[in-house]
Amino acid sequence: MALENLTLLVNGRQAFPEIIRCIDEAQTSLEINMFIWRDDRIGNRMAQAVLAAADRGVTVYISVDRYGVVLEKCEECKRSFFHKEQTLTEKMKSRLLEVFYPENTQPGAVKDEHTDLYQRIMAHPNIRVSADVFKADHSKFYIIDDRILFLGGVNIEDKENGQDLSGRVYGDYMARLEGEEYVRAFREKLATGRDTLEDVFFGLNQKEPVRRFEMEELYLDLINGAQQELHITMAYFSPLEHFVEAILAAHRRGVKVTVLIPQRANFQNDSNRRTICQLLKGSNGGIRVWLSPKMLHTKLVMNEKTISFGSTNITKKAFNQLDELNLFVPNDDSEFAKAMLESIASDIRISQPVTAPGEVEYNRLIAWLEGFMV
């Protein structure tokens, strides 16, 4: 199967119009699995497209993890499209998490409304919604007519479609895979854990129907398998000892290692900085580290042979607790791979290089607390 059937969508400004276009053309079925779905402009635009599809007879299934309500209510507009009420425990967790965000520009307490659009979706006979189940499912994907699959790291929220309330431009990726064979392979992976394609495969953390957590090992395989180049762009990058050592070992065997993280992450900023300080110190500045002015929500690990991106951060929680989903594709001369390499190069061109640990400041206590939490 040719990689021409794959399209890279860089950030929400490319992804959302394409996803909505495909929903507008859906004829039989639509499945959406989402971590965060806010009651904001893009959240309502997506909901309108879903409702229109259901009105013309498309069968719709939406799963929005209950886990996400804590994050939906602790930043940005603080309005959730599907989670209209919080338990006392969820409210307390949201208030606690607010402490760990570097900027406090989001509004105060906001009451969610049962909007007309929300009520029409919840009452529609062609739409089934699962929003109250706590699955700890961080993956994001859409399946349309069992023929088109979108997956990646983009939640349904305005900040992914431009910038957040602190002015940080968001960077992220989705992939569009067209062809019934891709959807069949994806469903087979979800059901049995088997990989059935030769040119691409799906990396999965999954608790049901059988617990399969493979993303930690797959990331380490990419790092340990690098012989020439290793690139990591990571939104939330914890200083896990075995990952730091694997990256340093790659540097010691002559691999060109580059790491790109947000200059001001919306969360886990101090933990991110602690990680790059360890990498810079351990390599005597030999590892090339860049701080992006964007809020890179990306989760990308790439060597000279393989590119992987999706929903999986390098954190304890991602590897041990959360359902995650990544796409693995060849790093070859395909248009998909070329688009990814150009996107990475474009991000690096506007980023600030860091060559020594002393150039990076962070709060050790906050970094420790962030590491404890995630």
Regions found by a protein language model. Name each.
Residues 1-374:
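Charged, low-complexity intrinsically disordered terminal segments
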